[in-house]
Amino acid sequence: MVPTGVGSLLQAALTHARVSDDGPRVLAVEPVTAACATASLAAGEPVAVPADVATSMAGLNCGTLSDLAWLAIRDGLDAGIGVTDEETARAIEQLEADGVRSGPCGAASAAAITAMLGCPDPMELGADSRIVLVSTEGR
């Protein structure tokens, strides 16, 4: 689960994950207000979304993917999910309780786990799944 703004970190994760055919599945995590990777994946082409709505995840509030990142996203991203500021705030609290000091962008991946509960799971997670949460912002 990779926090995604313009897509450069996501591109790096996808490039690594796709070295072998049995690499991990990769999920882009974005603010619901600026989910350009998810929208682009669904459209099959780069889509710019308005990023003029305030969000606590300022570092992910981009609205447009880099052209170079799009190629890796198009060819390798399994799914994307948008998270709200409220979900991210709860994730920050949970991470803090577990001894991890994170800001909103860093907690977005943890928020995605909770957001996926009760929804159709694009990643097909099970009891034996290993999940890697990438945190891009500590405090």
What would you call each of these model-derived segments?
Residues M1-D75, P120-R139:
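Glycine-rich phosphate/pyrophosphate-binding loop at beta-loop-alpha junctions
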Residues L65-D128:
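Active-site-adjacent helical/loop segments in soluble small-molecule enzymes
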